[in-house]
Amino acid sequence: MKSIRSLYKKLLQYVPDKRIWAYSSMALSAAAVCSYMGAYWFLWQSIVSILVIPAYEKAMYDAIIVVALMILRGILNIASATCSHYLGFRLETNLRKNGLHKLLDASSSFFDHNSSGEIRKVIDDNAAETHKTVAHLIPDNITAVMTPVLMFVLMFAIDYRLGILLILTTVIGVLQYRKMSEIGRASCRERV
């Protein structure tokens, strides 16, 4: 976690005036996840209104809220991606500029061993890769962290037994994944 934080800290030094776009992207992504989990909550309420308490008007109202929350989630995701892409494009531009400025200070012997086209390609390719990483990973990381946490909260809010069941299945899944990884690594070592 520290390495990711320090990586973003270093990258954001190239766009100090655009940091707000990173935080906006994070906030919008978090709001999108909350909207998504809210849709699940109202879907649950709608199902209860249909099957347990025959209250069809409430079920219809809850279904409309589900649709509205899913539309809101889409809008928030687009806004989050827009903010992170704006930051990514600015970062890409500034990285290219910074790389070219550093080249001006390079000795002439450096250019004897490396062609200018190769150097330019390396700078452009790495700046583009950094843009992709920043533009997509900022909202994706927030979603990847918040979704399971809010899913646990939602399950316990619906029924504590569902929450316990979700915890048990998660633990079993993690244990199976670890065992599968150990077997995969052992078979790779045998082949080598």
Language model segments and positions:
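Residue-level hotspots within the lipid-embedded alpha helices of multi-pass solute transporters
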Residues: 30-37, 70-74, 86-90, 106, ...
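Transmembrane helix-loop-helix hairpins at lipid-water interfaces of multipass membrane proteins
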Residues: 16, 22-79, 156-161
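A short amphipathic helical element positioned immediately N-terminal to and/or at the very start
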Residues: 3-22, 118-119, 123
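Residue-level signal for transmembrane alpha-helical positions in Major Facilitator Superfamily
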Residues: 35-42, 76, 80, 92-96, ...
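Hydrophobic alpha-helical transmembrane segments of ABC transporter permease domains
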Residues: 31, 35, 39, 124-168
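Juxtamembrane loop-to-helix connectors within ABC transporter transmembrane domains
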Residues: 15, 84-85, 104-149
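Hydrophobic/aromatic residues in alpha-helical transmembrane segments
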Residues: 39-47, 64, 80, 84, ...
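Cytoplasmic coupling helices
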Residues: 82-101, 142-143, 166-191
